[in-house]
Amino acid sequence: MLVTNHVLSGAVIGASTRRVAPAFLAGIVSHFVLDAAPHWGKWRGRPKFMQVAVPDGLLGLAMMAAMTAVAPRGRRAAVLAGMTGAALPDLDKPSRVFFGRSPFPHVVDAFHWKIQNEAPHRFKYEVAAGLAFALAAVGLLRGVRRLSVRQVLP
């Protein structure tokens, strides 16, 4: 799954839990749950992977900034923790590019690789998931403002 979607799901988790440690841990768990769900992937070589990964990583960082900015002050730390936890397991990819190895033990990398349910024709799932997570996060963080009768009928 795209890291942007992991970030947005982490924002939902942080907004829902409102506590830093549970948000971080739930974010990590959510990463593996989402990676086990059907999603877009199966890149044919590193150049194609990088064409997707670089813009996705930058968009993920932008979403982290946006969701942190949208979050009310009292929820910001939990939202940031949820997003960080949700994105953390994918640090293996840039670590391999820049340092030649994953920061995680082999058993974690093997599990992460084994659970992937990717196919090249599932981009629509990524878009749908991203929209759903973004709307849920903004809804939880900003709330649905109710109109009073006085606002509708002067």
Residue ranges of model-derived segments:
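N-terminal membrane-targeting hydrophobic helices
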Residues: 1-154
